[in-house]
């Protein structure tokens, strides 16, 4: 009896004039799921703590992020297929656009996503040719994202980001966060890479072509989330259950690989608003035949929240609603379906917030409540009340009568 966990990234919002994209979207299928299940709100980490997508997904799978999270870099790197070794220092990277004179650290960020560039494969090839005192690994992620790994003796993840995390600010120098030789050495290597990467990208033919077309150059990399790979017990060892993750986004694929899940990326799944939702839903339904837990990740709502695009987010929710229709035909005497988000990405904030997210659990044995609409304004009225992300899977396993008893 499997669990289907659907995580719609950044789905929920703070109201604008009393409305959110989710509350005003036409979504009969999402509303039907709310009507069929037990509803509530959820703090994926804890009240008032703004979750990352990585930490929240760890929590949703039952892993304490305060114990197992060591930075976004190694998870992102795992997601793009880099095998992280002991001592490696991994970063998450964005291709970005910078302007100004002088070194990379004198230049100002004008777009942290380089106009949402889609294909960076040629740029990645050029970056791999950079020579450093240590081995360099660079892999393409989804869209403007990438992963950068430094491999060598005497490195440390106790170093700062180079991403200022805002436009209009200068690129940051990497500085050691510990008073030791390893951190100082690593910071120096990161700064050397930053400058050399900028020189390679600024003069790359692809960027000259982009400039001629009036597009933003992807002429810098912004690094953040330095980390070394932690020891994480596999989901199978931890729970005795087989896990499958269906995702296109490198970070979520990385979470899956870190916990030992099988990861599936259906054809046409992109992690943006043009993703092949039909293929992802079909893959999830098929996976329920072979796995105990299937995590289906949907990314575009988060991207549209970061862009501050109310109408775009609303439209994508309506598209998602249409494409999940086949899930209503599942046998809920044998399957537990959970629909939720990993965090809020409000239109007015354009970033993650700690606002609790709506959640509904559908199974024939749930104590159905009177909620009939899936939204931020209705979910809190439901019978689940307010839960934590780490509670979610336990609740589902209890409904399926495969939870272990605590005590005599």
From Swiss-Prot:
Cofactor(s) of this protein: Mn(2+)
Biological processes, Gene Ontology terms: glycolytic process
Temperature dependence of activity: Optimum temperature is 60 degrees Celsius. Does not lose activity after 120 minutes at 60 degrees Celsius at pH7 with 50 uM of manganese chloride and 5 mM of magnesium chloride.
GO terms assigned for molecular function: metal ion binding; phosphoglycerate mutase activity
InterPro entries: Alkaline_phosphatase_core_sf, ApgAM_prokaryotes, Metalloenzyme, Pglycerate_mutase_ApgM
Catalytic activity, reaction form: (2R)-2-phosphoglycerate = (2R)-3-phosphoglycerate
Family per similarity comment: Belongs to the BPG-independent phosphoglycerate mutase family. A-PGAM subfamily.
NCBIfam families: apgM (TIGR00306), PRK04024.1 (NF003104)
Protein purpose: Catalyzes the interconversion of 2-phosphoglycerate and 3-phosphoglycerate.
Protein name: 2,3-bisphosphoglycerate-independent phosphoglycerate mutase 1
Originating species: Archaeoglobus fulgidus (strain ATCC 49558 / DSM 4304 / JCM 9628 / NBRC 100126 / VC-16)
């Amino acid at each position: 009896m499997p669990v289907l966990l659907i995580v719609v990234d950044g789905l929920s919002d703070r109201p604008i004039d009393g409305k959110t994209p989710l509350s005003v979207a036409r979504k009969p299928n999402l509303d039907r799921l709310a009507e069929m299940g037990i509803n509530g709100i959820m703090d994926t980490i804890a009240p008032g703590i703004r979750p990352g997508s990585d930490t929240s997904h760890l929590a949703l799978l039952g892993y304490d992020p305060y114990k197992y999270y060591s930075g976004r870099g190694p998870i992102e790197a795992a997601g793009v297929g880099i095998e992280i070794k002991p001592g490696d220092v991994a970063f998450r990277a964005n291709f970005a656009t910078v302007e100004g004179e002088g070194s990379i650290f004198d230049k100002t960020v004008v777009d942290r996503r380089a106009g949402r560039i889609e294909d960076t494969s040629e740029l990645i090839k050029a970056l791999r040719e950079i020579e450093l005192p240590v081995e360099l690994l660079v892999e393409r992620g989804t869209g403007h994202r990438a992963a950068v790994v430094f491999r060598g003796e005497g490195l440390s993840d106790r170093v700062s980001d180079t991403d200022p995390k805002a436009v209009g600010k200068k690129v940051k120098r990497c500085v050691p966060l510990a008073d030791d030789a390893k951190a100082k050495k690593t910071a120096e290597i990161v700064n050397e890479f930053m400058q050399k990467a900028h020189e390679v990208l600024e003069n790359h033919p692809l960027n000259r072509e982009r400039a001629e077309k009036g597009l933003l150059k992807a002429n810098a990399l912004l690094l953040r989330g330095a980390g070394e790979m932690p020891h994480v017990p596999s989901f199978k060892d931890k729970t005795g259950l087989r896990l499958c993750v269906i995702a296109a986004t490198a970070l979520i694929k990385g979470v899956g690989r870190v916990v030992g899940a099988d990861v599936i990326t259906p054809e046409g799944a992109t992690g943006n608003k043009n993703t092949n939702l039909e293929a992802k839903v079909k893959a999830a339904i098929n996976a329920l035949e072979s796995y105990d837990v299937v995590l289906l990740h949907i990314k575009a709502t988060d991207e549209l929240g970061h862009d501050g695009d109310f109408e775009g987010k609303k439209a994508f929710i309506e598209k998602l609603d249409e494409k999940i229709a086949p899930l209503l035909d599942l046998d809920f005497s044998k399957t537990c379906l959970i629909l939720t988000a990993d965090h809020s990405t409000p239109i007015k904030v354009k970033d993650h917030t700690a606002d609790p997210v709506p959640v509904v659990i559908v199974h024939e044995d749930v104590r159905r409540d009177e909620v009939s609409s899936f939204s931020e304004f209705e979910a809190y009225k439901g019978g689940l009340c307010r839960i934590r992300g780490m509670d979610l899977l336990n609740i589902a396993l209890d409904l399926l009568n495969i939870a272990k008893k605590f005590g005599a």
